[in-house]
Structure formats: C-alpha cells, structure tokens
Amino acid sequence: MKRKGFKFKKEVQDNMKKLLSLALATVMALGLVSCGNSSSGGNSATSGSAASGSASGADWPTKSINIVVPWSAGGDTDFHARTLGQYLEKELGVSVTVVNTTGGGGSVASTEVKNSDPDGYTFLAFDTAMALNHASGITDFGGEAFDPVAIIGKSCGEFLVTQGDAPYDTIPELIEYTKAHPGEVRMAANTGATSYYAAIKLSEQGADLNIVNSGSSSERVAALLCDQINLSVNAYGVIGQYIETGDLKILGCLATERSETYADVPTAVDQGVDLSYDLIYNLLAPKGTDPAIIEKMSEACQKIIEEDSSYAEAIATSYGEKPFYMNSSEAVDFLKGEDDMYMEYADLFQAKS
C-alpha cells in the first residue's frame, strides 16, 4: 500500500492538475525520458538572437525579444519565463520568445547570453543555480557578469520527493534507510544546481546516496514516475498532481521557512536536518546593455508582477507563489550576496564534482 507522506492543502491540489498534465506531456513529447530505457536530451535550441547592433533605449523595443532558459520546457524556471513573457508581450508590444538552451547544469545558456550582443533583445531567465554553477567551478562567473534586470520570482519552496511506496516517510527515515542500504537510493542531482546542493548536504549528514544526473525538473518527475530514480528535488507546481494520486510523496520542504501554501509540510530543519535554501528566479541581460533598456524592462516586469492581478493568480494557481520583485539595483546586491554565500562551499562542491 502506498504511504501518504506529506500532502498539500486540499484547496490547492486541483489547481495544479492542468499544468502538470501539460508539463509532463511536453517532456514525453520531446522524448526527454523514456520509461525502461536510459535517455538524455541535448540542447533543445540556441538563442536565435537577433542580428547584432545596439538598440537605443529611446525607441526600444522595435522587434522580437528572446528570453533564454537554461532548462527544458515544463519546469519551474521555464514556467516563470513563459508566464512573464506572455504578459511582457502585451506590455511592450512586441513578441517575446522563450528559447530552451539546455546543458552543463545551465552553464551553456548562461555562457551564451553572457557572450551575446548587448542589444536589448536577448535576456537570460535563470535561478539560484547560477550561483551554484559558479561555486561548483562549472563557470568562472556569477551575476556580476551580467546586467541584472530584476528578480522576478521566489519559489514557495522545493521539496524532497520520492515514490509513493518508498519505505521512508521523512528525511531522517531516508537517511537511516540509506545507511542500512548504501548506494541503493538513486538521487537525481545536477552538478551546479540546487538539487546538487541538497544531495551534498544530505551526504554530509550521513545519507549514502547514489547520485545521478537526470536533467531538468520536469525530466526528474518523469524519471521518478518511471522508477529510473528514487529521489528528487522539485518545485510545487511540478509534483502536486502526483502527490494527490499517491504516485509520489513528499519527505519534506527544503525552504528556509514554511509557507502558508504548504503549512502542513515540515521543512528539513523542522525535522532536525541541516538543509535549507530559497530558490529565486532572475532576469538578466548581457553586460553593456543600455541602462535605459534595463530600466524599461525592469519597470515592465514590476508593473506585471506587482500590479496585474491575473499574473498573480497565474503563479498562485500553478506554483502556490506570491508575486515577488526586486528592481535592477536590488538584484545586483541580491545576486552578489547569493554568489558569496554559495562560494563558501566551493571547495566542497568541487571536491564532489
């Protein structure tokens, strides 16, 4: 019989079903995960940026904008970029295309955008993994290599998730199980991503895990459902439907504090496990982009995030989040602090790589 684990409040469960069906369908349609067979996805696209040449802040934008996402379609960072992009089209009056450029734990996309022309038509939508890429030695740069536009969202928490019939229901039970069954539990963790940080912190506290690379958030869910892996770190909107059906269950929340959205789910710290972090979503431009363009884009994001009730409803319905925004100057300071924090773990990250 499948164990229940921790579940979301009933009033938010139905809101996720449509999103999750579409997300998993996207993953399967792209052939990113095949049950019963190992598979890997290559880069889904390049940035397709417009012809080089600087744009004037006075008349920007005059053509299509590309937002490059380092992960495949169907995950949380992709969701935030696509949702914001739809509203930016209305606000800016030009088309906004989301381009999924995968690989290297997000470093392929970040390097591509860093080296792009600062013409105001190519942006990067990334998350906390950018700082972890730097700390892990995957890249030699952090947020300082870009002109930050804004912090565009804050996750209500990532969750440690396993199959519904797994023989452990909490994080301490998981750790004890792996001690008795060393290497048996396969945890998906991408080097330089939050999942990798979680795996290292669990290992520090005695968990004996078989750490494997299994792609983006949506790919990890598909791999869990196919029993290719046993443990994953995922955001709210990617797992809710499968928690409700009992196919998956939550062992704990990895955020720094509980959210009212999932108040019944204890954090890892609540369970006596030293593992917590916040997942932040950001929007960045290549270094040297006209400050007037940065300001216009940041103000457009602010108007959508802070004033548009339909946007607030969209992120609440799909990911249980509240609107969260920081302007460009605030983003500069935040990204530096985030980078500095994870660089304290650089020796440990690189030793495990």
Placement of each model-derived feature along the sequence:
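N-terminal (or domain-start) structured segment
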Residues: 43, 48-144, 184, 191-195, ...
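An extracytoplasmic/periplasmic, membrane-proximal ligand-sensing/linker region
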Residues: 62-64, 204, 289-353
